[in-house]
Amino acid sequence: MGEVGQAQALRIGIAFGEGGKNDRSFNQSAAEGAAKAKEDLQVEIFDFEPTDPSQIGQGVRKFAEEGFDLVVGVGFALEASITTTAKEFQDVKFAVIDSVSPEESNVASLVFREQEGSFLVGYLAGKQTQTGVVGFLGGMDIPLIHRFEAGYRAGVEYACKEDGITCKVIPNYVGTTPAAWNDPAKAKEISAAQQTQGADIIYAAAGGSGLGLIDFVKQEKCLKAADLPSGVSFIRDPFKDVPKPADYASACGEDSRPMFFIGVDANQNYLGDADNNPETLNYGFTSMLKRVDVATYDSIKAVVEGTFKGGLQDFSLANDGVGYALDDFNKALIPADLISKVEAVKQDIIQGKITVPENR
């Protein structure tokens, strides 16, 4: 549980999903938004982390029974308990992230157009892939994650069509239960299989499982020409002038290309820094930003200011609810002319000139 602040402060309960608040991704982003609200708005933050899937939702009821001012459910798996509890506790305000509750009077449903942000990171991957093969690593095989896959695939294909090349997207999922969000070992196995098929950039939308991909990429570092499967070859070398970490040459040799991951939800670029030197090649290509931190913070702020409203709230490219990460860690991987191109694509999506699919 969080620390207790001033007696008059509003009490906010954060019920996390599978993976917990230190997953460096989805849940952690919500935790960071809550921490900022505690600092800026002088609210008390309490949290509940399930130790197994059967405990998901327990925190929601506990916070409601204690009369909290706002209860936030982090993840679609919390929707059922949020909806049931909200009907019973009409004086308590609720917010659910990544799902839509039919209980609109006192529940804010915070949803994201993940496909739009995924299109942009897919576009970047399509422009910079060195093999024409990229991977997608989903967590739980559900429609929510299919949106990430659909947008990513469409972005890759859009970029490759512009460049007159044929690209392949390899999709795999960790599993079909909530445990799929927290199984980095399985994600590592999938990453290895995608590498053997020639994937040089892999995008994970898998919560804590995505850390398995990140570990794998930093461990492997590259694809070697001798290991490429039949029909796959190096088609370009966009990173040849980027200084490599000291151990790259000995591990990879000359006839190789670096391998990259694309992070998700939070900015995970920094996790690709293998030698604590942002000036050398970073294995984090970019991250699809899903501003769960902003959604969490804004919900708390609305309660503090008395402007809270139930119902659907949509976060998209148009309101910076999703996007892509560019920072000191990956600036050498995405040149200025490509930034201009992806920004133009972003505007085309916002203006409806490009329609991004939601389904695979």
Spans of features found by a protein language model:
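A residue-level marker of the well-folded mature domains of exported/periplasmic proteins
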Residues: 2-360
